[in-house]
Amino acid sequence: MLLDDLYEIVEPITADLGYILWGIEVVGSGKLTIRIFIDHENGVSVDDCQIVSKEISAVFDVEDPVSGKYILEVSSPGMNRQIFNIIQAQALVGFNVKAVTLAPVGSQTKFKGVLERVEGNSVILNLEDGKEISFDFDELKKLRVSPDFS
């Protein structure tokens, strides 16, 4: 699978450069966009993104993991970072999040609330209406931090 191959190639590159690979997202059809999110204990600058992008591009030129043309984007995960795995979710307990499910729960697929806790492979949200809801992480299409500026 493309995503697994990309992680296998990109993880050692980012680690060797001193960055944390936060996640990889592949979007589009035809000409793909490969988004690589990096983090660092001191934050991530534009220069950091350029360094990582240059190294990854050089390896992609040799390994050729993507057939056809693609766009490579390297950035920090940002304040409204996507949560790519259960370990990241555990570290973000207490944060406001938005969740999108793969299949409707009741009649909705979008939920907003506080990431209350993580139990095994499940995330438990305290929704804005005070109700608690649990999702298996694999049932989520997307889970993202939703900063509250109020």
From Swiss-Prot:
GO cellular component terms, A-Z: cytosol
Functional summary from the UniProt entry: Required for maturation of 30S ribosomal subunits.
Coiled coil: none
Gene it is expressed from: rimP
Family: Belongs to the RimP family.
Pfam (any one): DUF150_C
GO biological process, one term: translation
Listed InterPro entries: Ribosome_maturation_RimP, RimP_C, RimP_C_sf, RimP_N, RimP_N_sf
Alphabetic keyword roster: Cytoplasm, Ribosome biogenesis
Major location (coarse): cytoplasm
Subcellular localization, as worded in the UniProt entry: Cytoplasm
Stored NCBIfam families: PRK14633.1
HAMAP family given in the database record: RimP
Protein's UniProt name: Ribosome maturation factor RimP
